[in-house]
A protein has these predicted regions:
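Active-site- or binding-pocket-proximal scaffold segments within functional domains
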Residues: 1-167
Length: 167
């Protein structure tokens, strides 16, 4: 079985050197993507042929996006996006459970300080998105930021410096 589509969720606000992301592109030798056409030559999911690798930046630090903090509202925003993408790819989710998880999403939930407590032992290195793209010699097109990041900004929440440059 080969992967038809890769989804990468990236924490926009994490500034720990150890947690800098490894961005992907179709040219990566280590990524073996399946042909987006099914056995009959028809697209398995029509949108996959347009975007086989989807990388999306979400508000928060590593555990805000992936979960693990007491207020997991931001993690549920990210989980909601994953569930939506999975359904677009043909995965059937239990509607009641999907709706309950979507209801837990809070795009204005707090962004935790990843350098607090034991996290303070990690090296601090502010994330420069454009430098990450250049460093990895990626051809990923425009950087994609989840719409919840923009809604946070409109609601008066702080924004990552790289996003503020886009405004």
């Amino acid at each position: 079985l080969k992967t038809r589509q890769l989804l990468l969720l990236i924490a926009l606000d994490d500034e720990r050197n150890t947690f800098h992301p490894r961005l992907w592109n179709d040219a990566d030798d280590c990524i073996d993507l399946a042909d987006p056409r099914g056995r009959d030559g028809q697209p398995v999911a029509p949108h996959i042929q347009h975007e086989r690798i989807s990388q999306l930046w979400f508000a928060g630090v590593h555990s805000n996006v992936g979960g693990g903090y007491p207020d997991d509202g931001l993690a549920h925003v990210a989980l909601g996006w994953i569930m939506d993408q999975a359904e677009l790819n043909g995965l059937r989710l239990e509607p009641q459970i999907r709706d309950e998880l979507h209801a837990l999403a809070d795009e204005n939930a707090p962004i935790y300080d990843s350098r607090h407590g034991l996290g303070g032992y990690y090296r601090y290195n502010p994330r420069r998105i454009e430098a990450l793209v250049r460093l990895n010699k990626l051809r990923i097109g425009p950087v994609k930021v989840h719409e919840s990041v923009m809604r946070r900004i409109r609601a008066g929440q702080r924004a990552h410096a790289a996003v503020e440059q886009l405004l």
